[in-house]
Amino acid sequence: MVKDLVGYRFYPTGEELINHYLKNKILGKTWLVDEAISEINICSYDPIYLPSLSKIKSDDPVWYFFCPKEYTSAKKKVTKRTTSSGYWKATGVDRKIKDKRGNRGEIGIKKTLVYYEGRVPKGVWTPWVMHEYHITCLPQDQRNYVICQVMYKGEDGDVPSGGNNSSEPSQSLVSDSNTVRATSPTALEFEKPGQENFFGMSVDDLGTPKNEQEDFSLWDVLDPDMLFSDNNNPTVHPQAPHLTPNDDEFLGGLRHVNREQVEYLFANEDFISRPTLSMTENRNDHRPKKALSGIIVDYSSDSNSDAESISATSYQGTSSPGDDSVGSSNRQFLQTGGDEILSSCNDLQTYGEPSISSSTRQSQLTRSIIRPKQEVKQDTSRAVDSDTSIDKESSMVKTEKKSWFITEEAMERNRNNPRYIYLMRMIIGFILLLALISNIISVLQNLNPAMKFDRER
């Protein structure tokens, strides 16, 4: 029979529950639905007893029931949700069920409820969940039944099974989305010792240390004769990749490769296997042994000029700790490096005409040496100006810091003294002012009669 097939389950969709089962139940066509879903009053039972009341016996933690609508009172259309030991609490938003095969309109809604043990508001949550399907495509007076889909979301061993014990329990759990199923894990297959895998290697080969295995060169691996997989040929090394004899293109290309060229490319194995060194030293604190201040001699040639023009550019670098100032370092360089500059100028005779006299060269060299001295003076004047500007900026920063500290102290005082203290002080001062004014008025009134009495006399 079909019901005895492995994986066969009664799990209709929301559209099928409303369009077929609930509609036929309300319209009186019970012979079409009574075989699958039983009718009970779901609030008369605790959820733990519901699996045994299901019409279809299944090991899945999902059961279906027809339930007549029951209200708390005749006047109030409030659905009854309480049981003998707990209550069903609605949660989430109602979902619309649409007819995907017919007019694609709304045919019903689905409510989600969770069962709590105890009474409101001290109920204890349980893993029992119920989806309540209501039909909306029929008139209001005919909507007297709902379909309750009861599910258990806890552990499988905690809920009594509604199926027969002869069948082997299924490990599949059906989720709310009706799509995800978790199956019991199967045993993983591992390779046995001595059995070769897809790459021609066995577990024994993997366990052998590298230094104990035979040493093969790159050409031995790329040799076309080694690439054919022949199970009857014991000379094929298990570490070589196996190819079928039909791969003529690849093998033909390998036969045209010169072996000497391949071995030459990989001859220096130490250089290939040597790890590269990364320069991670910090060069910020590096100081040279000599001062990096001097003259770079440049030359340029022009076809219209009769003599070679030599230009020198001075540059300033990091001085050694023994140098006192920029001027001293440049002076030392000019004294000690004059001969080197002359020798370098003698060598620069490639672009100009060879008829340049020694006096012309010396005058050009003198101009190139005097120019750095003037630049050094300009640098010193700029340094003095920068020092004065730095002093001004530091004084401005100090004044700003002082003003900031004063502002912070005032803010701290305001923070320590709340606003109502200032109000109290103002009121007290105003009262004292009124008292002082009243005293002055009384004194003046006392003085007026005395003055009148003196006048009468």
Swiss-Prot record:
Domain NAC: from-to ranges: 4-153
GO MF, one example: DNA-binding transcription factor activity
Segments forming a coiled coil: none
GO BP annotations, alphabetical order: positive regulation of DNA-templated transcription
Low complexity bias locations: 302-311
Induction section of the entry: By salt stress and abscisic acid (ABA) in roots.
UniProt note: domains: The NAC domain includes a DNA binding domain and a dimerization domain.
Pfam families: NAM
Membrane protein topology class: Single-pass membrane protein
Gene that this sequence comes from: NAC69
Role: Transcription activator activated by proteolytic cleavage through regulated intramembrane proteolysis (RIP). Involved in salt stress response during seed germination and seedling growth. Binds the auxin-responsive IAA30 gene promoter and may serve as a molecular link that interconnects a developmental feedback loop of auxin signaling with a salt signal transduction pathway during seed germination.
Compositional bias annotation for Polar residues: 162-180, 312-332
Membrane-spanning ranges: 421-441
Keywords for this protein: Activator, DNA-binding, Membrane, Nucleus, Stress response, Transcription, Transcription regulation, Transmembrane, Transmembrane helix
Record's subcellular location: Membrane; Nucleus
GO CC term (a single one): plasma membrane
Protein name in the entry: NAC domain-containing protein 69
PROSITE patterns associated with the record: NAC
Annotated region described as Disordered, given as residue ranges: 158-180, 302-332
Phenotypic consequence of gene deletion: No visible phenotype under normal growth conditions, but mutant plants mutant exhibit reduced sensitivity to high salinity during seed germination and seedling development.
